[in-house]
């Protein structure tokens, strides 16, 4: 699916019946959340609120409200094709040199995709068609959603934040929520291990007391947004990866106030700085956990310039108890993670992050077990391989005869193949999401690994059970009789 910017993507969704325009006046205060939530829970379309109450800028919600739309945003027609995106990422993370001519021919598509990686800088860009600066900047003109009754203030939710560390050539793109604090101020909620926060820490060490340049793009194209939430290798720019997804180079433009580059086709861009030491209490907000989070201090982002397209569109979302849009994104990105893990751990058959577990707090892994203790090695591998799994509290490991995505299968394995004392691994004092109020200390808690695999000699002294399986000849015989038996005839008559 080819598109160049958010507007082209919206048009393509509309052609497919995947976008609904809403003409009624809908309030960004709570009403949009309720409508978007009801729509997402039944797999409904993206929503374009054309007449937000009190504003003249349309609001786009539920853009990634189904895994299929996430796949389309990544340039794929089917969710299953996201495995190919994962294979490409695995290749970029650790490229294997061709082993011969035939292997070179097979790898040519990957090498051709890499040609789309460099960015293209434009001298003029749609995102700078209108320019406001200084006292003319007023965030109150944007229809920023106030999502839940006890939220402290309106919240920018899809802000693509662009930063660069003092010793880095590549820019970092990240999605961080931002509380509206005033006319030209937001609170930048980035966790300490995220790219933007690390760039800021490095800047403060290299340039103590100096302002840290930041830009935030609202309404960037889907490929760039999705690249920002995908585990791209540290050596690869998210802009470059977005070019791979999109099939053509990412077009960027230099900010008016600094050297950072922003997506040329973004609907709205906020430029400004963070003053070292300037922080403010952020929250509470209803979060993806289904609870209001605690209040914590984060840096303040001061906006000096607001640039935008003519007749801009404001892109927004809400977070709440799954399913919400982050949970849907997690479900789709799950397919990207599988090939990455399999390249490092070929014994892994499948990997599943249940959306009910906030899409990262629990993982189910199926594997081809090869030796005693193998399941524990896989647990450790999951926790340590990607930063995205640093906050995963529970890892369940099963054999490959179990369907990782079927709870009936997983629970059967847990209850028949596990001894709680022998097969439970507990690790204390590990990094935990500070939003996880179940941990005894903010940001620090425990992890649990559950070995639900069949036990090998050395792991048990008992004779292990043999699964019940019907004789194949009998199964074949019943297959030939099945239609003739017409066992469900009464059900058909009732219909």
UniProtKB/Swiss-Prot annotation:
Keywords: Cell membrane, Decarboxylase, Flavoprotein, FMN, Lyase, Manganese, Membrane, Metal-binding, Ubiquinone biosynthesis. It is a peripheral membrane protein. One of its GO terms (biological process) is ubiquinone biosynthetic process. Signal peptide: none annotated. It is an enzyme of class 4 (lyase). Binds 1 prenylated FMN per subunit. GO terms for cellular component: cytosol; plasma membrane. Its cofactor is prenylated FMN; Mn(2+). Catalyzes the decarboxylation of 3-octaprenyl-4-hydroxy benzoate to 2-octaprenylphenol, an intermediate step in ubiquinone biosynthesis. Homohexamer. Belongs to the UbiD family. This is 3-octaprenyl-4-hydroxybenzoate carboxy-lyase. It comes from Edwardsiella ictaluri (strain 93-146). The lineage of its organism: Bacteria, Pseudomonadati, Pseudomonadota, Gammaproteobacteria, Enterobacterales.
